[in-house]
Amino acid sequence: MFGDLASPFVLVLGLGESGLAMARWCARHGARARVADTREAPANLPALRAHVPDAEFIGGPFAPSLLEGVALVAISPGLSPLDAAVAALLDGARERAVPVWGEIELFARALAGLKLAQGYAPRVLAITGTNGKTTTTALAGALVQRAGKTVGVAGNISPSALDKLTECVDAGTLPDVWVLELSSFQLETTHTLDADAATILNITQDHLDWHGSMAAYAAAKGRIFGAGTVRVLNRQDADVMAFAGKRGGDVTFGTDEPATPEALGLLRDGGIPWIVLAEADDDDLPKPARRKKGDTTPAAPVPVRLKRLMPADALRIRGLHNATNAMAALALCRAIGLPASALLHGLRDYAGEPHRVELIAAFDDIEFFDDSKGTNVGATVAALSGLSKRVVLIAGGDGKGQDFSPLAAPVAQYARAVVLIGRDAPRIRAALADSGVELVEAATLEAAVQEAAARAQAGDAVLLSPACASFDMFRNYEHRAQVFHEAVAALAADRGVML
């Protein structure tokens, strides 16, 4: 389970969900664990004491002495390598030739160990991207199940991959397929994962405070592809297409018409957008001449015919961005040979995930959407463009150092007004100053709902899509969503509508 390391002494950094899972996993497989957290009494400390009673816990600022006697560092995804104390420990580990793994690396090595011990060889699908990861992961898991396979869905989506694997091992129910949602944080310390198929949905500015630069952020995303992985790529995102394989065999998706075999896209016919598959139409073409060794001339393009799969409007999840998520999930499942008919039925049945452009109420001919999970600019751009109607947007919070200027064009095109909340409201206001849209600031989310509803007209939507993290005003994005739901319910009650 630990490669060449036999029962190593492991330093686990961070005691969040992943840190606790790594400590439990290491102890289960004979390793001694030292667990360190910058908090003196993290919330998971009682669980660590209960499940790993022999673990050594050290709370407080990280110190170089944590590395004494350690053969492996297992680092939690929330800890940035740019943090001075974390960086010092990682430098110390490198100087001592101590490997640094994250939870997904431990998971990948666990699968390799199970293959050697039991012949267990599941298919693995992996999903990353700035936005849409959770929806695509949950949808891919539902499609796998609809196709008659057992499935384990884990990773960034929760539960942790190691906890889910432990549960399956103990129950004797190891799944046919693993579907993993992977964040850039998790991928940063992943080295040997070789998924059967993987996708990068999109790459837009996010987590620059953690990675330091867009180049570093994108590079972390690219670690999702192993040597044998089928790459499922958003062909309309140049940063994603930079990871196209040199030998071909990639599968692409997008909201345009596909032009290469196996690609997915949209065909608009009579005002109806259809999800279509490009199939090779080479029946009448002459057999290509044998290519000489070293010939780098690009192969002639293969003509395609477009096969209609289903109207995009038949999806229960709203917006063009969700159509692309659906195409990515479909492409991943097709890459491991699952039957198309079952997959298409699964696409029609999937109802979506909470807090992701979720319709929570409709009254007075106005719809209210909760996109509290939209914690970056790219997510809000996708939500605005995907609803295809006039929107009063509620945005703001902790901007994590993002550039808000990409909001200006979609706000000008789709928004009737923008109500701003939170710490970075002034920065968003400055970015939208020339959009020609009314900009209003509110002290609380409850007040923002009132301001937004007062400006919405019949047929409009009020959209909470903050483009920011929530921690300046709320415990987390779920708490922000809860406050939004309660404020919308109170507004409805004031207007004589019970939700």
Swiss-Prot record:
The keyword Ion transport does not apply. Cell wall formation. Catalyzes the addition of glutamate to the nucleotide precursor UDP-N-acetylmuramoyl-L-alanine (UMA). One of its GO terms (biological process) is cell wall organization. Its EC number is 6.3.2.9. Pathway: Cell wall biogenesis; peptidoglycan biosynthesis. Belongs to the MurCDEF family. NCBIfam families: murD. It catalyses: UDP-N-acetyl-alpha-D-muramoyl-L-alanine + D-glutamate + ATP = UDP-N-acetyl-alpha-D-muramoyl-L-alanyl-D-glutamate + ADP + phosphate + H(+). GO terms for cellular component: cytoplasm. Coiled coil: none annotated. ATP binds at G129, T130, N131, G132, K133, T134, T135. It is found in: Cytoplasm. PANTHER family: UDP-N-ACETYLMURAMOYLALANINE--D-GLUTAMATE LIGASE. It is an enzyme of class 6 (ligase). The keyword Cell cycle applies. GO terms for molecular function: ATP binding; UDP-N-acetylmuramoylalanine-D-glutamate ligase activity. It comes from the Bacteria. This is UDP-N-acetylmuramoylalanine--D-glutamate ligase. InterPro entries: Mur-like_cat_sf, Mur_ligase_C, Mur_ligase_C_dom_sf, Mur_ligase_cen, MurD. Pfam families: Mur_ligase_C, Mur_ligase_M, MurD-like_N. Keywords: ATP-binding, Cell cycle, Cell division, Cell shape, Cell wall biogenesis/degradation, Cytoplasm, Ligase, Nucleotide-binding, Peptidoglycan synthesis.
